[in-house]
Amino acid sequence: MLESFSDLSALGGVTFERDPYADFHALQAESYCGTLISDTNGGGTINAERSFLTGFAYPHSRYRRDTWSYVRYFAAQGYSTQGGHPGYEWFYDRRSVNENLGFSRYDFMENHYEALPVGGSDYHGRPDDAAFFADRRADYLARDPSQSYFSFSVTYQGHSPYSDTALEGGVYCAHDGLSDGAYCMINNYLSSVADTGRQLRAYVDSFREDEAPVVLVFFGDHKPTLGTGNCYYAELGVNVNENSDEGCRNLYSVPYLIWANDAARRVLGDRFTGQGETISPGFLMAELFDRCGWDGPAWMQLQRDTRRRIPVIHRQELFVVDGKWESELQPDARPLYDELRIAEYYVREKLQRREQGSS
């Protein structure tokens, strides 16, 4: 999962002097890719993170006890389960929650990344994407090759704040039509995005010739906040008014892509290319399983049934149904949503209740 990664070129009217998305778009051209509608803007990273790992919709529980997740599902299929995030384990209570979601090992600043050399640049004391992706590659190479490998990691580069008083990287948007603050902040954000794209491409390249089948999933957690009240989006000519369909899509849309090396394409019988649906983060794991040709657990079957009609379930009970934003579901769609939430409660509580009963 890529911190604050979004494709501003997908928003109508935004033009660049240099393309900050050249490497990312090259990856999209050889991947299965689509759009997520995130629950948040500029923060709340764990909403997308935990939705992907569980399939659960907003609002989330606090995960204070062992809870069912796709991490546990992979572990039950014989996978090792690990990951990393160059942030502190106490933030969002990630250490405890990740243990409760079933990760056997997770690297944080305290137990791993504080000792990692970061080379020429860092981000608030954290490793940059070059160091982070190299570390995740090293973790993969150190795996037990006799065991299948599931790794979920979260980047830090791209995290706000972005300076609005000085340029800290390259120039991608011209100054014409932008205030000084917008010019600096937007270009600083795009400089980070461009570097993330370069690091993604290098990371993907490192798996191309791997004899083991490898499938990689990348997605943004949310769009960045650009200026007070997102005022700098307006200077770009982008509508982010939440009272309109266009504004909601612009404000909450982030990209996802699913890439597979040749070995995985042969084994799974899929090219892993083409255009995917616009969905909520909670449906992304099901999208991955569909590409892999895997059935998944019963919970995922219900997710698929719901996704066909309601592909986006947004916080505060906003939905996308038949391509349109709705604040109130139609009578024929409401039972699908209600059934999903009831099943979600059961799936979430089942493991906790089982453990309570055995104690």
Regions picked out by a protein language model, each given a short descriptive name:
Residues 1-359:
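Solvent-exposed soluble domains appended to multi-pass membrane proteins
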